[in-house]
């Protein structure tokens, strides 16, 4: 099932890239239109990677729920972190659709909270392992999940940065056109 989903995502990514290339070749867009097409080609990769990370998390969860107990503080923190990362994706996609630079800046700023959560949970897990080395597998599973969540947040930031590019022609404060 996971392999099939990955194939579908990869196929959709290639289709979007193909359509963008066809637009570039046939229409020879300039200025804003060129930035929009370039952004679509870049953003599709981030969206595909978000899907890959979500798939990786889904693969870990069935085992994780057997080794971590309900009410586990690290799991509760990870769930809160996941909600923040999810909101970043939602906000980044809304900013992209509306070409809203202010909304994009808010997504970029929100990444600090996800990064903070990642480091806090990682520290908690390190303490857990130090206190009881037998818990290393359960801690590593959760560590993988939070790393994927952190990367999802980073991909949402990338999408937001491309929104800024559409609006300004600048990517990460560097003029591209």
Predicted regions and their residues:
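Secondary-structure edge/capping motif, primarily at the C-terminal ends of alpha-helices
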Residues: 1, 20-27, 61-68, 89-99, ...
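Conserved alpha-helical segments that form or flank metal/cofactor-binding pockets of metalloenzymes
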Residues: 12-20, 51-54
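Hydrophobic/aromatic-rich structural module bridging two neighboring secondary-structure elements via a short loop
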Residues: 18-46
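Divalent-cation-assisted or electrostatically stabilized phosphate/pyrophosphate-binding catalytic cores
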Residues: 28-38, 69-86, 97, 101-112, ...
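A structural feature that tracks compact, well-ordered secondary-structure segments
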Residues: 41-65, 92-96, 104-108, 115-122, ...
């Amino acid at each position: 099932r996971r392999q099939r989903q990955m194939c579908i995502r990869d196929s959709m990514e290639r289709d979007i890239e193909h359509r963008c290339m066809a637009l570039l070749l046939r229409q020879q867009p300039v200025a804003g239109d060129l930035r929009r097409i370039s952004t679509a080609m870049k953003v599709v990769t981030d969206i595909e990677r978000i899907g890959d990370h979500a798939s990786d998390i889904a693969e870990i969860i069935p085992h994780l729920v057997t080794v971590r107990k309900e009410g586990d503080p690290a799991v509760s923190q990870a769930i809160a972190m996941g909600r923040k990362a999810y909101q970043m994706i939602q906000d980044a996609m809304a900013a992209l659709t509306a070409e809203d630079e202010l909304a994009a800046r808010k997504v970029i700023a929100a990444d600090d909270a996800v990064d903070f959560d990642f480091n806090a949970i990682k520290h908690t897990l390190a303490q857990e392992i130090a206190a009881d080395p037998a818990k290393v597998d359960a801690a590593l599973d959760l560590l993988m999940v939070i790393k994927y969540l952190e990367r999802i947040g980073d991909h949402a930031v990338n999408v937001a940065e491309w929104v800024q590019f559409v609006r300004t022609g600048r990517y990460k404060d560097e003029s591209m056109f």
